[in-house]
């Protein structure tokens, strides 16, 4: 709560004083005497202040404390009246009270405000406007659960049955006590015991079926959310993955989706069960003793006030824990994924220290969460114990007055204890539900994100020549728009020709390959394939016709066949072997135990570097592409394999772009393009350059 804004508090004070002045006049004489008039006065103050502050746009800043300001007086005198003869039952209306009483009322609000400001986490109030979106998120979660509606209906039916059975058990427990305490009636005693057993068995069976139905629905919802999120992530643009850490994405896919699926099956389940049971239990409590029931209701404001202080702190620390766990997971993935590099540089201890620091941050947050939760539970328990003592005191008075039997008081205490338990469940599950809705907000932000990509094309001609034209192409990465990577590139890749693209590191060679695969869009100029803009081609068609083999090929866990036929449907074994033969991979595949069905391990860890390159080339060739891009992908191949690749290229006049660093590659090229600082270097300029790439091209020209 922001204490630095006096305007809303001054407005609240002036409006309240004006309203009290009206209630002190003839309007106040219309209110009934005693407690009903006191409650009517408080309710009237609350409604008028709430409406006026909402119209004035100030409700968000001071609305939390309106119930405290308006209802403290009725609650106090109601407690005095319900306790009985031990205290006076005369009432004092705020409108007609002395200035000292009014100042005490305002002082209680000021003290509560100070406690709230100290205990609430920083920025809690600023986050409240965003929480208005929780209702929309909950509705969206319900819509997401629509396919599981039959299972949820069954679960809620069993929930209602379990609650119904459970509510009768304390009633018959009280009857047993009354039978044992008075004239013993064997038939009545046997009947009470029978119904206790019947309701207990029925409650247990219904609760088990309820839990099983909710868990089944939860598993289906969880799988559906994960599938949708993973599908959405794979369709994002590359800039998104450059800006978002892998650990964060893994956290969303694992922990956040689980929290989302629990929202209905766990949170809504317990919340609805507790709500229905609280209403039903209060009905039975009213049958036993209305006076004790109204006295027990006074525990609700204290519980809500404690929740108002605890819940924002709990939500804040949970969000910090989510981020800390994601960072710790990121450290593990980086260290394990780059284990060879870690060992090569002897950095094992450094990675252990990084992970220890990340875990220490998690430990601090976990300790803070558990400490605050423990204090909250202690306060709740003390309040519940105090209320039980008060109810026992008043209950004994009613027993002595003959208003309640001993069994009735026992039933009431059992009901009251169960009500307290379910009220705490309502408060706790409300906070937990907000946590899960917060996780849903992050997941939905990914599901709703629209990739910065052009509309998918539809061109899929039966025959493609493979002519590639860069026409004054410029490009800057989305994360660094002020720094151009390519500037005004104009050149043509001809079918049946090999074009070597050379240049120093950072000159834009890999960016040219990325543009040619339609991974990014030029910021200027046009990129044409057979005279048509690249973006107009169908996505799957384009990536069968234009294929890249990288310098460090990426393989996946699975068999040799799975990796060669990756992304293709109904790829026959004969096609796989033909591509492997063209890539000179058939020799080592034939030596494997299961041939093309042999598992190669995670990222192809069971293969040598040269074998990985051959499999990657075979994966490209099996698509029979018209344009092949080799990013120094033949560095680990022998002369025979390179010659086989040249033979494959010349068979159907395919277009080949080779990003080269070796003289041998440049000498075999039909065309050499030199990039420097994102621009093509002309041959006249090349003669004046003294770097290694100019030397390579000059040697090729002289040859």
UniProtKB/Swiss-Prot annotation:
The protein's organism comes out as Rattus norvegicus
Protein's name according to its UniProt entry: Antigen peptide transporter 2
Domain comment, in the record's words? Answer: The peptide-binding site is shared between the cytoplasmic loops of TAP1 and TAP2. The nucleotide-binding domain (NBD) mediates ATP hydrolysis coupled to peptide translocation. Two ATP molecules are accommodated at distinct nucleotide binding sites (NBS) at TAP1-TAP2 dimer interface. Each NBS is formed by Walker A (GxxGxGKST) and Q-loop motifs from NBD of one subunit, while the NBD from the second subunit completes the active site by contributing the C loop motif (LSGGQ). Each ATP molecule is coordinated via the beta- and gamma-phosphates to a Mg2+ ion, which is necessary for ATP hydrolysis.
Reaction catalysed by this enzyme: a peptide antigen(in) + ATP + H2O = a peptide antigen(out) + ADP + phosphate + H(+)
Topology of this chain in the membrane: Multi-pass membrane protein
Write out the function statement from the record: ABC transporter associated with antigen processing. In complex with TAP1 mediates unidirectional translocation of peptide antigens from cytosol to endoplasmic reticulum (ER) for loading onto MHC class I (MHCI) molecules. Uses the chemical energy of ATP to export peptides against the concentration gradient. During the transport cycle alternates between 'inward-facing' state with peptide binding site facing the cytosol to 'outward-facing' state with peptide binding site facing the ER lumen.
Q: Where in the cell is it found?
A: Endoplasmic reticulum membrane
The record's PROSITE patterns line, in alphabetical order, gives:
ABC_TM1F, ABC_TRANSPORTER_1, ABC_TRANSPORTER_2
């Amino acid at each position: 709560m922001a204490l630095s804004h006096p305007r809303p508090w001054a407005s609240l004070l002036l409006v309240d004083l004006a309203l009290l002045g009206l209630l002190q006049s003839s309007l106040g004489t219309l209110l009934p005497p005693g407690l009903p008039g006191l409650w009517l006065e408080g309710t009237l103050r609350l409604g008028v202040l709430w409406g006026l502050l909402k119209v004035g746009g100030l409700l968000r800043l001071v609305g939390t404390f309106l119930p405290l300001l308006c209802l403290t007086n009725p609650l106090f005198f109601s407690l005095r009246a319900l306790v009985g003869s031990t205290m006076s039952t005369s009432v004092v209306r705020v409108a007609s009270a002395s200035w000292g009483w009014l100042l005490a009322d305002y002082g209680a609000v000021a003290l509560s405000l100070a406690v709230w400001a100290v205990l609430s986490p920083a920025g809690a109030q600023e986050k409240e406007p965003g929480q208005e979106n929780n209702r929309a998120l909950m509705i969206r979660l319900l819509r997401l659960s629509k396919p599981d509606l039959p299972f949820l209906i069954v679960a809620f039916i069993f929930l209602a049955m379990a609650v119904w059975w459970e509510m009768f058990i304390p009633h018959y427990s009280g009857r047993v006590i009354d039978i044992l305490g008075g004239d013993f009636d064997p038939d009545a005693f046997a009947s009470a015991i029978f119904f206790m057993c019947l309701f207990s068995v029925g409650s247990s069976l219904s609760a088990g079926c309820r839990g099983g139905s909710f868990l089944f629905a939860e598993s289906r919802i969880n799988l559906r959310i994960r599938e949708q999120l993973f599908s959405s992530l794979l369709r994002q643009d590359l800039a998104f993955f450059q800006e978002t850490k892998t650990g964060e994405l893994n956290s969303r896919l694992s922990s956040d989706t689980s929290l989302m699926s629990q929202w209905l099956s766990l949170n809504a389940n317990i919340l609805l069960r507790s709500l229905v049971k609280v209403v039903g239990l209060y009905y039975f409590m009213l049958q036993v003793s209305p006076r004790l029931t109204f006295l027990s209701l006074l525990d609700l404001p204290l519980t809500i006030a404690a929740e108002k202080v605890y819940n924002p702190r709990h939500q804040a620390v949970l969000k910090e824990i989510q981020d800390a766990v994601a960072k710790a997971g990121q450290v593990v993935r980086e260290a394990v994924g780059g284990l060879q590099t870690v060992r090569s540089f002897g950095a094992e201890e450094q990675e252990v220290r990084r992970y220890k620091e990340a875990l220490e941050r998690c430990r601090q947050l976990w300790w803070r969460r558990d400490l605050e939760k423990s204090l909250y539970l202690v306060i709740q328990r003390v309040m519940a114990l105090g209320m039980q003592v008060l109810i026992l005191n008043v209950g004994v008075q009613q027993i002595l007055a003959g208003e309640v039997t001993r069994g009735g008081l026992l039933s009431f205490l059992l009901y009251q204890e169960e009500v307290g338990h379910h009220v705490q469940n309502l408060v706790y599950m409300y906070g937990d539900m907000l946590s899960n809705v917060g996780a849903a907000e992050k997941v939905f932000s990914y599901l709703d994100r629209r990739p910065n990509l052009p509309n998918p094309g539809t061109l899929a001609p039966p025959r493609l020549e493979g002519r590639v034209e860069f026409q004054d192409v410029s490009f800057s990465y989305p994360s660094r728009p002020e720094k151009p990577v390519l500037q005004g590139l104009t050149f043509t890749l001809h079918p049946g020709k090999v074009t070597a693209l050379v240049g120093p590191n950072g000159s834009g060679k890999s960016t040219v390959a990325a543009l040619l695969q339609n991974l990014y869009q030029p910021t200027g100029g046009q990129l044409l394939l057979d005279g048509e803009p690249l973006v107009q081609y169908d996505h799957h068609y384009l990536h069968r016709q234009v294929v890249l083999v990288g310098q460090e090929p990426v393989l996946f866990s699975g068999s040799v066949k799975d990796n060669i036929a990756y992304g293709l449907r109904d790829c026959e074994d004969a096609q796989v072997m033909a591509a492997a033969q063209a890539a000179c991979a058939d020799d080592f595949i034939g030596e494997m135990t299961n041939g093309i069905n042999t598992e190669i391990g995670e990222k192809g860890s069971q293969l040598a570097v040269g074998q990985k390159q051959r499999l990657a080339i075979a994966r490209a060739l099996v698509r029979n592409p018209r344009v092949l891009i080799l990013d120094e992908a033949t560095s680990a191949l022998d002369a025979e394999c390179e010659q086989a690749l040249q033979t494959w290229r010349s068979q159907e006049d395919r277009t080949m772009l080779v990003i080269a660093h070796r003289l041998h590659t440049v000498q075999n090229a039909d065309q050499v393009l030199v990039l420097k600082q994102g621009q093509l270097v002309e041959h006249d300029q090349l003669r004046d350059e003294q770097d290694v790439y100019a030397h390579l091209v000059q040697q090729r020209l002289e040859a």
